[in-house]
């Protein structure tokens, strides 16, 4: 049916049902569903309260008290991000309870690399037709991510927009604000040749490169419910939807206890070559021993099944390392010990060297 005729038919049907005129619901927006979602998520939001933020959702804006949070002369740092086409996996698999963790992780990990403590988070959830149960599952993940990061979920926007999205589709965006006391921001200005590069393990693909992941799955002829070829105990969807690791609390602990971290890089889109140079002085480069990278099975499978070259893997995925720390050589063992005690798997990946050309220099080969 042509679009104009279809719209006319819908209008005629609506008018025949309601002789008194059209309603917002006739246009596809269900205010009652929105209210039902708010009631479902109120306890989830309440569970993320922290010093500085103890209000209820529903106001025109969220409040945060920096003094109550213990800051005296803070610099505020803001970040926003999304989850990319990892959402398509969640939508097609009907599994929505973890992408909210990804959303928070992508934002708060970008804050902590600047030495900031995440304080509060806001989300934007847009869909064509609101399903309160689906929305509640998504917000439950967001609340869990906030709990892991120690930040408060102080507000958000749920947008039901008929005609903008296909049935079942949705999009997410996150916004996080953190703070650090003046003079304690990262990177520091004392990075020198010989500083050690530590790598913190990832949980999997995290939230970057999923357009390539989905293409490889497509050409492999696999279904999301099939056992994952690289993890037979879980379905392919479950394995690929493993949430992005949130590094906030272990890193903040290491910063406070050692004062040995000079720089941090969140390994997202662009991998090592695009992200590590962003935190280094122009005169220095990172020399990485690729044989020290513990490549996770999912990346070996993606490389083999998709015929993806090692260099392309390194500039698309994290390949098993989700966060990089640059530390003074004499404090590397201490920093690594604190991170490991906090539950991180840490590898010594290389060191800082004088830069001659590229910002990242590889030694050895990636063991895919």
Curated annotation (Swiss-Prot):
Gene, per the UniProt record: purM
GO molecular function: ATP binding; phosphoribosylamine-glycine ligase activity; phosphoribosylformylglycinamidine cyclo-ligase activity
UniProt KW Cytoplasm keyword: yes
Enzyme Commission (EC) number: 6.3.3.1
Biological or metabolic pathway of the protein: Purine metabolism; IMP biosynthesis via de novo pathway; 5-amino-1-(5-phospho-D-ribosyl)imidazole from N(2)-formyl-N(1)-(5-phospho-D-ribosyl)glycinamide: step 2/2
HAMAP family: AIRS
Stated name of the protein: Phosphoribosylformylglycinamidine cyclo-ligase
Biological process according to GO: 'de novo' IMP biosynthetic process; adenine biosynthetic process
Entry-linked InterPro entries: PurM-like_C_dom, PurM-like_C_sf, PurM-like_N, PurM-like_N_sf, PurM_cligase
Domain of life: Bacteria
